[in-house]
């Protein structure tokens, strides 16, 4: 938040319990510019693997928790950097309180990760479908719950697979509150489609000055997510590293293989 740089996040596609594969993927992503990495914690074996993973990586590790709050408690005991909980499936107040207590004790931030595909039933009944207002209401309900127990080390995400909904939710939230925001369009699909949705959604918010961390969600290798995130930040004027390639779209006046040349240059400079 504040004057800090917008950070790039991705998520491992490996089973977290496979420590070697997960560590290898995290370090590969970190080498090309990933600054925060999230892993799925589906069961106790995933939670138990966290300590070994943390000891072999150099960037913060976030535990993605759904349904079973006890996995958040186990992750917190094993050196996790942040815990993401989903308000739509984490359970009742007593379970949230248990997560808050351990995170407060160990100084672990919590991300309230609202998702349009898993909103609480009462919000769906109230709004009819996952509207921007429904996403924001869910976020504030859980912010108030965490604040009730004196917990403020929180960031929020309100993701939707519909770009206008995600953008409207982030703008509405920011107009009412200044908690840090993690932004991204979820379930965007294959690379070409996903890049367009993410550039529109994330890019428009970044140009508004909204967003503290970003993730480009693609049905592809997470490496492509990191490259895309870097390009979005550069296009928004928020990342100065690397090279901005300026090239003609070509027309009948072109006398060289410009497309081939540009592709060679792009490949050579991709990791800059």
Model-found features: residue ranges?
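Catalytic alpha/beta core domains of metabolic enzymes, predominantly
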Residues: 115, 123-272
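N-terminal amphipathic alpha-helix/helix-capping segment at the start of soluble metabolic enzymes
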Residues: 1-11, 104, 261, 267
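Alpha-helix-loop-beta-strand connector modules within alpha/beta enzyme cores
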Residues: 44-65, 98-110, 172-181, 265-270
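Glycine-rich, proline-tolerant flexible connector loops at the mouths of alpha/beta enzymes
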Residues: 13-19, 30-57, 84-92, 153-163
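Active-site mouth loops of central-metabolism enzymes
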Residues: 2-21, 40-42, 59-67, 88, ...
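Hydrophobic or amphipathic alpha-helical targeting/insertion segments
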Residues: 70-111
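Structural preference for beta-strand elements that scaffold enzyme active sites
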Residues: 5-9, 36-38, 58-64, 81-84, ...
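Glycine-rich phosphate-binding active-site loops on the catalytic face of alpha/beta enzymes
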Residues: 33-35, 78-93, 185, 208-222
């Amino acid at each position: 938040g504040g004057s800090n740089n917008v950070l790039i996040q991705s998520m491992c596609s490996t089973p977290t319990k496979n420590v070697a594969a997960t560590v290898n993927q995290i370090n590969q992503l970190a080498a090309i510019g990933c600054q925060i990495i999230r892993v799925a914690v589906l069961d106790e074996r995933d939670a138990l693997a966290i300590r070994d993973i943390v000891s072999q990586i150099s960037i913060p590790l976030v535990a993605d928790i759904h349904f079973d709050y006890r996995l958040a408690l186990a992750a917190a005991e094993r050196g996790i950097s942040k815990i993401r909980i989903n308000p739509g499936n984490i359970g009742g107040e007593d379970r949230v309180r248990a997560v808050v207590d351990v995170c407060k004790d160990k100084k672990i931030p919590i991300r309230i990760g609202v998702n349009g595909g898993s909103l609480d039933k009462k919000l769906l009944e109230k709004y009819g479908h996952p509207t921007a207002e429904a996403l924001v209401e869910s976020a504030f309900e859980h912010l108030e719950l965490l604040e009730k127990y004196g917990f403020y080390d929180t960031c929020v995400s309100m993701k939707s697979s519909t770009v206008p909904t995600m953008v409207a939710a982030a703008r509405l939230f920011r107009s009412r509150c200044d908690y840090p925001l993690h932004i991204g369009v979820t379930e965007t699909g294959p690379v070409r489609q996903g890049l367009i949705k993410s550039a529109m959604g994330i890019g428009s918010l970044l140009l508004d000055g909204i967003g503290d961390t970003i993730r480009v969600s693609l049905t592809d290798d997470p490496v492509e997510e990191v490259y895309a995130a870097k390009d979005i930040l550069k296009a928004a004027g928020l990342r100065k590293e690397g090279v901005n390639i300026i090239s003609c779209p070509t027309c009948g006046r072109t006398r060289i293989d410009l497309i081939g040349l540009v592709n060679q240059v792009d490949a050579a400079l991709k990791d800059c």
